[in-house]
């Protein structure tokens, strides 16, 4: 919800600064963006990296209009673009298309793949993960929709942790049972069971904090 997202951002941003250096829009689906039009009024981005069809949803159109009215620079995402975050730390666009983009986050030895905007041919263009290599964290695409999460991508990426972002009682019945079956043997965390999932890394170690099961965390050494 808008209030939950606003609260979580407030906890993570410095009290004296409510601006974002960059806002990355990796999908223009309505369910992905519905909270953002009100959020960006409170946390104003200095720059926007935009993936996907601007006319793809009502919220996407609202955001496009707001950025234009506020003279906020918007860059269209393309495969290979990179936001440098520091020494050996970056966010890179692995693929981009009408539905959005696939993001790779790297910080030292830590790597996370976020296939947020997967469309037709996206996974094929990435050789089902072979062109990316091993990652530590993988976000399931499309809340665990089977065609967006073939078993090959799990085998090729070999993630230490798989994160499933899905609402409790998803109206489409997601995640697909076939996807969950394919993940047997992998470490999986689900937002419908654990709430907000936070992954923290210094580039050598990774800590995972989960919200709904008390102050629990897992520490993982990256190799």
Identify the meaning behind each predicted range.
Residues 1-223:
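Non-globular, low-confidence helical/coil segments that flank catalytic cores
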């Amino acid at each position: 919800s808008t209030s939950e997202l606003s609260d979580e951002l407030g906890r993570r941003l410095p009290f004296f600064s409510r601006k974002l250096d960059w806002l990355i829009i990796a999908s223009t689906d309505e369910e992905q963006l519905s909270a953002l039009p009100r959020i960006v009024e409170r946390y104003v981005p200095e720059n926007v990296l935009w993936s996907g069809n601007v006319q793809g949803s009502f919220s996407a159109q609202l955001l496009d209009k707001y950025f234009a009215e506020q003279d906020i620079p918007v860059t269209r995402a393309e495969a290979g673009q990179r936001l440098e975050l520091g020494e050996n730390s970056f966010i890179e666009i692995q693929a981009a298309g009408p539905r959005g983009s696939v993001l790779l986050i790297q910080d030292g030895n830590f790597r996370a793949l976020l296939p947020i905007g997967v469309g037709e041919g996206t996974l094929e263009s990435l050789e089902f993960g072979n062109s990316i290599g091993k990652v530590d964290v993988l976000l399931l695409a499309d809340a665990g929709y089977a065609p967006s999460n073939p078993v090959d991508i799990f085998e090729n990426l070999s993630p230490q942790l798989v994160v499933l972002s899905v609402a409790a009682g998803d109206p489409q019945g997601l995640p697909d049972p076939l996807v969950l079956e394919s993940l047997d043997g992998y470490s999986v965390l689900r937002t419908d069971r654990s709430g907000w999932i936070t992954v923290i890394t210094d580039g050598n170690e990774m800590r995972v904090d989960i919200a709904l099961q008390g102050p629990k965390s897992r520490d993982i050494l990256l190799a």
